[in-house]
Design a protein with these regions (language model features):
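Short, glycine-/aromatic-enriched active-site segment of Class I SAM-dependent methyltransferases
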Residues: 87-105
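A conserved beta-strand element that flanks and buttresses the S-adenosyl-L-methionine
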Residues: 46-50
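Class I SAM-dependent methyltransferase SAM/SAH-binding core
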Residues: 1-32
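A short glycine-rich, Lys/Arg-flanked "PGG" loop and its adjoining helix->strand segment in the class I
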Residues: 61-74
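Core SAM-dependent methyltransferase catalytic element
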Residues: 122-147
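Short alpha-helix
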Residues: 106-123
Length: 147
């Protein structure tokens, strides 16, 4: 996460749950390919949750996914989320202004197909998907192909 507050609270939660041996929460830039790729030790599972839909630029998403593909071992997994639509887009845009200098943060709703194509182009094969009963949120699982 890029927020010191989120890193502090996330690390505290990991410790509170007794997961220090298997998890950590670090500060970083999810859209900096080299930074993501440098994850050490190399993860067997990468998770991107509630992030890509907040940014309109597919080049940013491509860089992030390319870094994930470099970081995650072949045969490892990527869990990623999507929001193909949302009934409260205007409310969300007006509420999420902290990272945009007070400007509205308009959610980029990618179709599931578009998101899956970005994941595939990065070197992952989609295996499964779940969607909530309202069709708002998706969670997908993909496996890192051998380069």
């Amino acid at each position: 996460d890029f927020s010191d507050i989120n890193v502090r609270d996330g690390a505290a939660l990991i410790h509170q749950k007794g997961l220090d041996a298997i998890a950590r929460f670090e500060k970083g830039d999810a859209f900096d390919q080299a930074s993501v790729a440098a994850a050490s030790p190399r993860p067997t599972v990468g998770i991107v949750s509630g992030l890509y839909e907040l940014f309109p630029d597919n080049d940013m998403v491509r860089r992030s996914l390319a870094g994930m593909a470099q970081a995650v071992e072949p045969g490892g997994y990527l869990l990623y989320t999507g929001q193909p639509w949302h009934p409260q887009l205007e409310l969300i845009a007006r509420a999420l202004t902290s990272h945009r200098g007070g400007q509205a943060w308009v959610m980029r709703r990618r179709s599931q197909s578009e998101m899956d194509q970005l994941v595939d182009a990065a070197g992952f094969e989609k295996l499964a998907q779940r969607i909530d009963e309202w069709g708002i949120f998706t969670v997908s699982l993909a496996r890192r192909r051998n380069p």
